[in-house]
Amino acid sequence: DMARWMGMDPAEKKDIAWNASSKRFMQGWYDKVLRPMERDGIDFWWLDWQQWDNDKEFPRLSNVWWINYTTFTDMERHHDTRPMLYHRWGGLGNHRYQIGFSGDAIISWKSLDFQPYYNSTASNVLYGYWSHDIGGHMGADSINPEMYIRWMQFGAFSPILRTHSTKNAGLNKEPWVFADKERDIIRDIIKQRYSLAPYIYTMARHAYDTGVSLCRPMYYDYPDAQEAYTNRNEYMFGDNYLVYPITQPMNNGVSLQKVWLPAGNDWYELTSGTMLKGGQTVERRFLLDEYPIYVKAGSIIPQYGDVKNLRRNDEAVTVTVYPGNADAEFVMYEDNGNDKQYATAYASTLLSATHSSEGTLRVSIGARKGEYSGMPAHRQYRLKLVASAVPEKVVVDGKQTDFEYDGNNLSLMVDIPETDCSKAKTIEVVYAKDAPVLTDGLIGK
């Protein structure tokens, strides 16, 4: 079909020269080659240097830049869903179209060590959606489980999490090819990533509206601190998480990591349950299933529970509140997830937490504002208070209710009956006046 479209005889089996600057060639490529496969169920395309650097007729036209643009806009014209494609960096301004992938990464600690810096500083040219070959692509015939787990931990707090490698049976990365302990760690990393989807999606909307990427260097948030420029591999993951991936092998089963914690607020260490003061550099120890993730004190994070996929947006949402003395809020964003009306058709829910001098924490789940196609009318919520003492009582909309307390993880859970999303919910957690805040690193102890 493509040969006939180009005025050639298919029986001659002649090559058709790539010519991205030819409107006829590109129209034929999309309509005769790609479109039939899209009708068979292909949702997005991964383009990968199937052409030379620059166009033959217009030498100053970058083939990568141009094909990213033409593929994105072709999908935009011919599909009801949002365009999506993977391709390489095409130059300044090309961030508008493709999700980038950073090439065939060498399997080495050195390669892993470079990626966090590379990932976050790309935000300086608005290139906020890098994806990487998690675990590395080539340069080895077998997987180092420790290195792969550290790479996965970084990947879970990257814009895109995907594993990839060259065709080599020794480099298979399915969780079940690992030993039980390693498999369980990998599974928990993936589940953690899924659980953060409401938070990540909200921050993705922020990036769309402001140009500030999900992953960005520390100097975006702390421009006056010298440490924000010298800690190259440390970055913010959205507004609430500070991440410093481990990129070196353990010594005697432990990784030592120095982490700079900016002044202005305290930081809750996710793996240990320790609250650390801001304005200092700390050296912390981490086992293989632990890594440096810090949450701003008092943060509210919307999360999913144990979801299997992200096809639906009506999943139960856990409102996780981290310890902190200041009042806090988070505006959770939602839209259809796949249609093209997201610019104007979306909804938001204000989540807030306020403290009273009498020892009561009041958490509010606001009435949802806005609307979009497929929006669920009702939703199940769960409140999770991290580092919480056992309360005297919990009251939901004026009625005392049951709660669960996890003594191992020092957390309080309150299940809220399925609620009309157009109506606000208020949860009051009443503590004794001398109730402690359990941020001394005893989680799991």
How would you label these PLM feature ranges?
Residues 269-288, 393-415:
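Solvent-exposed beta-strand/loop surfaces of large extracellular or lumenal domains
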Residues 236-237, 355-358, 405:
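Generic beta-strand structural signal
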Residues 293, 297-399, 416-423, 431-445:
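Accessory, solvent-exposed terminal regions and/or long lumenal/extracellular loops of proteins
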Residues 239-240, 272, 359-361, 408-410:
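Beta-strand-connecting loop/turn residues
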